[in-house]
Design a protein with these regions (language model features):
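Transmembrane-helix signature of multi-pass solute transporters
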Residues: 72-82, 99, 161-168, 235-239, ...
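Small-residue-rich segments within alpha-helical transmembrane domains of MFS-like 12-TM solute carriers
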Residues: 11, 15, 81, 97-105, ...
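C-terminal membrane-cytosol helix-exit motif in multi-pass small-molecule transporters
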Residues: 160-179, 204-214, 232-247, 514-519
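Small-residue-rich alpha-helical segments with characteristic i,i+4
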Residues: 124, 133-139, 143, 283, ...
Length: 531
């Protein structure tokens, strides 16, 4: 609980500001597009620091590094709340992302070292609660605070939690002996920072996060800026791999421990964690957007669609933590992905007549599958790993989840726009005067709008009678056309959501065969994990 507090706060902060962007833009005199940099700046800084955290602990120690990150996160949160202009707020969010990027991997490594292997699943259950539930709670909490108080309080909220976390960490957490030996060795031999490796890492993941966050908004490769950052990401990634392998061959300490990917368990767990982040963050954004834009739900009610699923995960995580010590991780992961696939198949029945209860049960079913994934995926990531590599494992698995979440969000935004346009284009071909059904429908709607008998739908009703010199007939025609287009757009958008969910279903189902490539862990695998 001591270290989970700060991680919950950090993951919460990655989504809590989403619903407050219009208020932030208005309060600081910025446009909506400019305000999105509040999100982008945080994500980019966070992605850069995540894999570098393990490297930094060898210089100053894990406890000290963790406390510095908590302190930086708390101070920068207060600065965000006090920011008088958007550029200052964006700068403070960069600092906040730097502080937040070191929290999750440090906590995971602390848990792996603190708890014996047979109790590690239960420890990861608490950590999983923070990581899995926070994205679902964030938008609801952010909306409530913004509506009832002020957007600045979404940042001030972090300060007391940081203070509590710092106090508890200083009293309870200690570095294990091997970390102290690493720090002593580093200080004795002198600090030799891998500056080039860190620069290439920052350019790779910073560019990737920027592209994922801004790609759809700027029309992907239709934008020279996006094309430039994609090129920079690819070139930097190739150069980073070459440089880090060169550092390994020369016996130096590279910033990324790429030798972990030689182990099938870790390589597959990295892939599975990416998909978990993709599905978790993607659907967490998908459902509220669907109910708000197409079903007319308020932000608060949209949040209540997600909340029961969060409660389900809170109940299931301790159960899965207990089972992880009794059941082979492959079986738990297989059950989780099968459950997730079936829940997405059910969710592919989205339509405009769904009730609140149906939506809630869809999410609860999905949450029950997600709960069976996080803990066992982390468990297999640590199998066969040396204790001195715990920091590297935690940094890379958290990076996989974050990049997966960003990719899922970008995928949803892109496919929603493109599939909606595709379905609209397909449907509009039949809406021509040559179609008898269309003519009859238009005639019926025009009569209803023109007659004002109360039978016409209210959509676009304000248009009727305001068509200019053409009189009421002209206005009724425009009102009828507006009503038909509104219906067409709603149906096209609904079909686009269904398409996205079907793609997600295929994506998740494709992970099940990967489990057959996992070597069966020996009976003492749990005991050897992290040692």
């Amino acid at each position: 609980m001591t270290v989970t507090l700060a991680t919950f706060m950090e993951v919460l902060d990655s989504s809590i500001a989403n619903v407050s962007l219009p208020h932030i833009a208005g309060g600081l005199g910025a446009t909506q597009d400019e305000a999105t940099w509040v999100l982008t700046a945080y994500l980019v800084a966070n992605a850069v620091i995540l894999p570098a955290g393990a490297y930094m602990t060898t210089f100053i120690g894990r406890k000290k590094f963790y406390m510095i990150c908590v302190a930086l996160f708390g101070i920068s949160s207060a600065m965000c709340g006090l920011a008088p202009t958007l550029p200052i707020l964006v700068f403070c969010r960069v600092l906040q992302g730097v502080g937040g990027g070191g929290l999750a991997p440090s906590e995971q490594a602390i848990l792996a070292d603190t708890f014996p292997p047979e109790k590690r699943g239960q420890a990861f259950a608490m950590y999983g609660l923070a990581v899995v539930c926070a994205p679902a709670i964030g938008p609801t909490l952010g909306g409530y605070i913004t509506d009832n108080f002020d957007w600045r309080w979404i940042f001030y909220l972090n300060v007391p939690i940081c203070l509590i976390s710092l106090f508890l960490t200083s009293r309870i957490v200690e570095d294990p002996p091997y970390v102290k030996k690493q720090v002593a060795k580093t200080q004795r031999e002198g600090i030799k920072l891998d500056f080039l490796g860190f620069g290439l890492l920052a350019l790779t993941f910073g560019s990737l996060e920027f592209v994922l966050d801004k790609g759809q908004e700027d029309d992907w490769f239709g934008s020279h800026v996006i094309a430039f950052f994609v090129t920079a990401c690819i070139v930097a990634f190739v150069a980073m791999i070459w440089w880090e392998l060169k550092e390994l061959r020369e016996g130096k300490r590279p910033i990324l421990n790429l030798t972990l990917f030689k182990r099938p368990q870790f390589a597959i767990s990295f892939t599975l964690m990416f998909v978990l982040g993709f599905a978790l963050y993607g659907t967490t954004i998908l459902i509220p957007q669907f109910v708000q834009t197409l079903l007319g739900y308020t932000a608060e009610l949209a949040g209540l669609v997600l909340s029961p699923a969060g409660l389900m995960m809170m109940c299931m995580m301790p159960v899965v933590g207990f089972l992880s010590g009794k059941v082979e991780p492959r079986k738990l992961i297989g059950f989780g992905f099968l459950n997730l696939t079936l829940s997405l198949l059910w969710m592919a029945n989205l339509n405009l007549q769904l009730s609140y209860g149906q939506l809630v049960f869809m999410r609860i079913f999905q949450a029950s599958g997600l709960a069976f994934l996080f803990i066992p995926i982390n468990t297999i990531a640590y199998i066969g790993v040396k204790q001195t590599e715990n920091n590297d494992v935690s940094g890379l698995t958290n990076l996989a989840r974050n990049i997966g979440g960003s990719s899922g969000t970008a995928f949803m935004a892109t496919m929603l726009t493109r599939r909606t346009v595709a379905h609209e284009s397909s449907a509009v071909r039949n809406l021509t005067p040559a179609n008898p059904g269309y003519r009859a429908w238009m005639h019926s709607l025009e009569g209803a709008f023109k007659g004002g008998n109360g039978t016409a739908p209210p959509v676009a009703g304000a248009i009727a009678g305001h068509g200019g010199g053409g009189g009421a007939s002209f206005g009724a025609t425009h009102a009828a056309q507006a009503y038909i287009y509104n219906m067409l757009h709603r149906q096209a958008a609904t079909l686009a959501y269904v398409d996205i969910i079907r793609y997600l279903t295929i994506f998740c189902a494709a992970m099940i065969p990967l489990l057959f490539f996992l070597p069966k862990p020996p009976k003492n695998a749990a005991a050897s994990a992290g040692h």
